[in-house]
C-alpha cells in the first residue's frame, strides 16, 4: 500500500503540475500530499470500514459521515447544501474538538489491535491467470523479508493475492503464530499477543467489564455470558482464576460474538465509530480548510471521483478482470480464471470465522 499510494501521489503531482506550471516543486508536493491524504481518509471511511462491518445501517452512517444524508450524488454535484454535517457530511463543515484537543485515544489503540486478521500462511497467486506461484509463511512478507519477497514476486501479483485471500477472524485462538515469536531486525524476540495485553495494562486501560461500563454497555456477570463457546468460557475462568473483572479488554473483545456481519466485537465498535467521526471533525484539513482554495479545484475533483478500485487500476491495470463487477475493493475479488476454485493454503479455511491458529491471547505469556 505504501508503494501504491506513492504512485498515486506522483500521479496527483502530474495533474497539479499540468494545471499550475508556475508552482514550485515544494508547493506541488505538499498540495498533492493533502489530496492523497484526503483520498485515503475517504477510502477508509466509506470503503474499508463498510467492508469489515457490512451492515446496512452502518454503511448508511459511514456514507453520511463523508457525504451526509443528502447522499453522494448531491454532494458530488452541488457540494455542501447545508451547514449541518448530518445533511452534508463532516468534510467541509466547521472544525470542532468537542471540549478536548484531538488525539488518538488509548482506548482507540486498544480496539484497533487487529492482528488476528493477519493469516499465518498466504497462497501467492498470479494476477494474469490466478495460477499459484507459491505458498509462503506470512513472516516471509514481514519486516526486512519483504524486500527479498518483492524481488521474486511482482507487486501486481501481491495485490491480486491480497484481493482474493481472506483475512483471519477476530476471535480467540487465532492470533498469528509468527507474531507470537517475532524476531526484530536487531535480534529481539517479541510475543506481540503478550505485548498487546501488557501495553493496555501499562496505559491504564480499564479491564473488559469496566471498559463496557464506561461505554454504558451491560457488563457480563458470568464467563458463560461472554461467549457461547463453553471451551472458551472455561479457559477464561481458569486463566483469570474465576474473577470476571480481571479479563483484559483485548481478550474479552475477542471472546464476544460480534453482531451479524461485523468483523469485530460490538464493544470495539463503540470506540471505533466515535473516533471515525472525531478524527475527521477535529482536523482542519477535513473541515475549515477542506475547500478548493487549499486543495485546488482539481484536487477536490480527484478526491470526489476516485476510490480504491480507481487507484488500483490506475497503477496496475492488469487487475481489471479481478475487480470487474466488484463494488468495494476491500470485498473479495474475482478469482481468475472466473469461477475457478483454488485449494486453500495449508491450515487456512475458506470461511473466515472457521480459521483457527493453535494459540491466542489467552495462551500468551502474560499472567492475569
Task: Place the predicted regions along the sequence by residue.
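Structured, charged N-terminal subsegments at the starts of enzyme catalytic cores
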Residues: 1-14
